[in-house]
Amino acid sequence: YSTIINNNYNLYSQFEHKPCSDDEYDENIGFYWIKTLIEHIFGDQVELGIKYLKILYDNPKQALPILVLISEERSTGKTTFVDFLNIMFGANMVIINPQDISNGFNGSYADKNIIAIEESRFDSIQATEKLKNLATQKEILVNSKHIRQYSIPFYGKLIITSNDETKFSKVDSPEIRYWVRKVPTLKGKGNHQILSDVRKEIPQFLYYLNTLPEVDITKSRMVFEADEIATAELQTVKNESRSGLH
């Protein structure tokens, strides 16, 4: 890690956590709770979920789809997953609310690598378009209160959680920027101290990510092909958007 790169200040923050050493890695103990959480969130797409996390870790400049975790039920682990990422990525991530996207000020998230928007529903066309633009834009005009505007490269990846399973946002049929997953309830699998446990497991998990093959990031602008991340939940949202009932 270096704070200065090519005479420019590095806006990416140093990680609090480091991969464990070869001697410290124990595949029998490993990262049980992190693995359990990832499998719960991504379900039958868990391999894609691991690739997604590896890219977040290895290639912070790479654009990725907007990950949307939906469920109208309680105790699903959506917030726990966001909190886990926040622990892992530290100051490179921010958790905001939908109003922060809708208003004109973006200083809280413009320089972040991961932008999580919790319990979200975006009713206005303006907010929906802003989301889509953020997913692919390469530069952002930073607008903070009482500070002169300035431009910086933008590498933000969006994660949305919502309890609205069908109308969290308007999504047109041709849209390929969303990866929508319905998250089931934990059904007795809960661990009230899971955040403490996953924090301890992060060095083992980072070691594991480093052992995985490099992900091919050249096959699509957002790495994953549309059919790879297509889900029934995404199609339902598109159908609702097309019906005019949004």
Annotated model-derived regions:
Residues 105-110, 143-161:
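AAA+/SF3 P-loop NTPase mechanochemical coupling elements
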Residues 110-113, 137, 154-157, 173-179:
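Short glycine-/polar-rich loops that comprise or flank the Walker A/P-loop
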Residues 70, 216-246:
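DNA transaction DNA-binding modules
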Residues 123-128, 170-171:
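Conserved ATPase-coupling elements of RecA-like P-loop NTPase cores
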Residues 2-114, 120, 179-181, 209:
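P-loop NTPase catalytic core of nucleic-acid-dependent motor ATPases
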Residues 169-189:
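A short helix-turn-beta junction within AAA+ P-loop NTPase domains corresponding to the substrate/partner-engaging
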Residues 119-121, 138, 164-165:
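Conserved Walker B
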Residues 128-150:
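Conserved catalytic/switch belt of AAA+ P-loop NTPases
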